[in-house]
Amino acid sequence: MKISLKRIDDAFNFEAVNEDGKTVLIDAAEKLGGRNQGVRPTQMLLMARAGCSGIDIVSILKKQKQQIDDFQIEVEGEREVIKEEVAKVFAEIEVQFKLQGNIDPGKAKRAVELSMEKYCSVEKTLRLAGAKIGYKIYVNGKEA
């Protein structure tokens, strides 16, 4: 896996490109001198967390012939300073999986568990870094 990052203005705006030519803009907050024209690196980490499970869960549920009409994942992370360092790390992350459709809640729950515990490499990376990750699953508005 390889990406390339290029600065595209005189501030903090960067364009990241993957091996397939797909791009994403990265920028700092305005209060730090950025222009707010891209996502923050830590936001990208939470996006990656959601995307990783999203792919896992859709794959599992499709194999089980579950009809997914809508699927949203919301991720909220709390960061804290470790010891005397300036950088903040994610200490706690809460994930909400919201599925709509003709979906068996038990199958949805199992798909999420498999992603969280076995398949999602972003999840494993965050846990190894010390983040405590919790989650809730909703199928058609009801907690599963």
Regions found by a protein language model. Name each.
Residues 1-47, 58-144:
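Extended beta-strand/beta-hairpin segments
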